[in-house]
Every structure is written in C-alpha cells, then in structure tokens.
Amino acid sequence: MKQPSALSSLVEALRALPGVGPKSAQRIAYHLMQHDREGAERLGRSLLFATEHLQHCEKCNTFTEAQICEVCSDDERDPTLLCVVETPADQIMLEQTMTYRGLYFVLMGRLSPLDGIGPKEIHFDRLVRRASDGVVKEVVLATNFTNEGEATAHYLGQTLKARGLAVTRLARGVPVGGELEYVDAGTIARAMLDRRTM
C-alpha cells in the first residue's frame, strides 16, 4: 500500500532534521497525525513564525529577531574579547556559565572539506573583518573538540595570529570529540577560565 502523498511529504521533511533517519521520521509523522494533531499544528506554526522572524545578527551572525542581537547591543560586554563558536547552541552554553563577558562570532558550522564546507561557508571573511576592527585584542576559539572543530580552530588561529591578534583556545576538560552543546556548564566554565594561547 502506498502512503498518502501528504504523509510522504511530511516524512521527507522530518528526515532533513539531524539524526532523524527514515524510520524515525515515519514514526514521528505517524505519531503527530495519529496522537497529537494539535502539537503538529503548533509545531508548524512555530516553524513558520521562526522562519519569518529570525535573521542573523549583523555583527556576530547568531540568530536574532532584530538587526543586532541582545549580546552585541549590551554595553556592559567587553568589546576587546571575541569568542568564536560553531553554533548558537554553543553560544548559549557559554553564556550559561556566566564566566565570559566578551562578544561572540557564530560560524554556523565548521570546516569540513569532505562535505564541501570551506572558509566561505563558515563566514570566514566576516569573522576576519570583525576581529580586525581595531577594538578586539583577543580571539577565543571555542570550536568543538572534534576533528573538524580542531581543524577549524587551527585554520582560524593561524590566520588571525598572522593579523597580530592574540588567539586563545578553550582548555581541555571538554572531552575530545565533545560538542559544547552537550557539556555541562561547570566544565565549560573551567575550560573558558583555563583557555590557552595558540
């Protein structure tokens, strides 16, 4: 039996989510249609609202509803410190530690040549312009401790050091292969406080 095209379309859309394969997508779709139509409608409205209202901050590239995000607009932040993270989720984890009071730049990814992700795709030129504004004195590389995250940190570190900037890297404590989004706030706080020069 062939499933209805509307259901097939929903399953395909759910497969676009990270970590959701064909079977999981099908289970989610059936659950929403069979047991939680109200939740499905709420999910649809929330997705539509987010796509219509969220944009990238003109300064740091994170998600925001305004041209400039709340962090970049905060005069209490230290503009001489610029922390580079892979995702907005990583930025939120660092913020929850309450140990970092500088500004951010969100790459929205990491270098991965095998996947076709190079410097352009991680907004490298924007980062260099931001870091070279004459105000930033130290760039903290807080990319994940995965192979791609380490390669990204190395590439960024070499390039930014060549421009005369002090470049530091989060200290270990964040497990090798670990992603900041899944690390507890205490470990991230310790890694931020013990960051090292590159």
Curated annotation (Swiss-Prot):
Residues 80-175 form the Toprim domain. PROSITE patterns: RECR, TOPRIM. One of its GO terms (biological process) is DNA repair. GO terms for molecular function: DNA binding; zinc ion binding. InterPro entries: DNA_Rcmb_RecR, Rcmb_RecR, Rcmb_RecR_Znf, TOPRIM_dom, TOPRIM_RecR. Keywords: DNA damage, DNA recombination, DNA repair, Metal-binding, Zinc, Zinc-finger. It comes from Burkholderia vietnamiensis (strain G4 / LMG 22486). This is Recombination protein RecR. It holds the Pfam family RecR_ZnF. A zinc finger (C4-type) spans 57-72. Gene3D superfamilies: 3.40.1360.10, 6.10.250.240, RecR Domain 1. Belongs to the RecR family. PANTHER family: RECOMBINATION PROTEIN RECR (PTHR30446:SF0). May play a role in DNA repair. It seems to be involved in an RecBC-independent recombinational process of DNA repair. It may act with RecF and RecO.
